[in-house]
Amino acid sequence: MTLPLGASPTPHDAAALHQRLLARGIARLDDEAQLAALGAGGDALVLFLEDPVRVPESWDVAVVLPEVLAGLARAGRVVAAGFVPPELGRRWQARFGFRLWPTLLLLRGGALVGAIEGMRDWAEYEAQIPVLLDSPVQERRVALPVAAPAGERGCG
């Protein structure tokens, strides 16, 4: 499958990146209520963007996401979609446990199913997204900070 990429705006324009997604029917998620509403009835792909000046791959995934959604629709799978702007994404990053930007999360009923971190080849999206859609929700994980007692070194 080839992607009609077209001309991308300059990566220095985060507002243009957001407009590109909005023009393709992908909702901007600015708070918990919007995030919860997006996937309340089923599956939702949520794109966590970073500032495209810092992470230009944000542009790439913003181009790929509408194509992924179109392919899913052709296969009869309708999935809601939204994006989280960088300032909010940084606050929610620990909650969802991803490390790389941009990240595409699959949520089901607001719970995490899985993630695709960073920009990938098209074949990886084609292979991984159907697997995620057929996967169960992940058990909630709690990250606990680990510290060595005073005066001791950690592992090593």
Report each predicted region and the residues it spans.
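Non-globular targeting/processing and membrane-anchoring segments
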Residues: 1-44, 49-78, 87, 93-100, ...
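General small-molecule cofactor/ligand-binding pocket signal
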Residues: 82-84
